[in-house]
């Protein structure tokens, strides 16, 4: 079973802040986490079930560093539709 420690952070970008007004939370997680595991984490630790969950894997960008190619880390993020009136105090949202 997934643990709350598998949720790395809440993403705060222009897009995610706009989505928060509509009740959607953008969460960065461990790469092997699934939608069902994330749903269980929200039920267990926050006391509500998300209305909808969308996921995507974002590949790390290839960047040059001192003339050599490197790659940023890849990560997985979820768009979580939160029910009205639910709050996520433990993660700072």
Swiss-Prot record:
Transmembrane regions: none
Gene3D superfamilies, per database record: 3.30.70.330
Q: Single GO cellular component annotation? A: ribonucleoprotein complex
Which Gene Ontology molecular function entries are recorded, alphabetically? Answer: rRNA binding; structural constituent of ribosome
Please provide the record's keywords in A-Z order.
Ribonucleoprotein, Ribosomal protein, RNA-binding, rRNA-binding
Q: Among its keywords, does the record have rRNA-binding? A: yes
Please name one Pfam family that this protein belongs to. Ribosomal_L23
Q: Of which family is this protein a member?
A: Belongs to the universal ribosomal protein uL23 family.
Briefly state the protein's biological role.
One of the early assembly proteins it binds 23S rRNA. One of the proteins that surrounds the polypeptide exit tunnel on the outside of the ribosome. Forms the main docking site for trigger factor binding to the ribosome.
- State whether it acts alone or in a complex, and with which partners, per the record: Part of the 50S ribosomal subunit. Contacts protein L29, and trigger factor when it is bound to the ribosome.
Q: What is this protein called?
A: Large ribosomal subunit protein uL23
Species whose genome carries this gene: Helicobacter acinonychis (strain Sheeba)
């Amino acid at each position: 079973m997934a643990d709350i420690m598998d949720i790395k952070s809440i993403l705060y970008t222009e897009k995610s802040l706009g989505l928060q007004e509509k009740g959607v939370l953008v969460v960065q997680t461990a790469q092997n986490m699934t939608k069902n595991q994330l749903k269980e984490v929200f039920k267990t630790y926050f006391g509500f079930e998300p209305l909808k969950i969308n996921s995507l894997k974002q590949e790390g960008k290839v960047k040059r560093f001192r003339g050599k190619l490197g790659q940023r880390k890849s990560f997985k993020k979820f768009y979580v539709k939160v029910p009205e009136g639910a709050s996520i105090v433990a993660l700072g949202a």
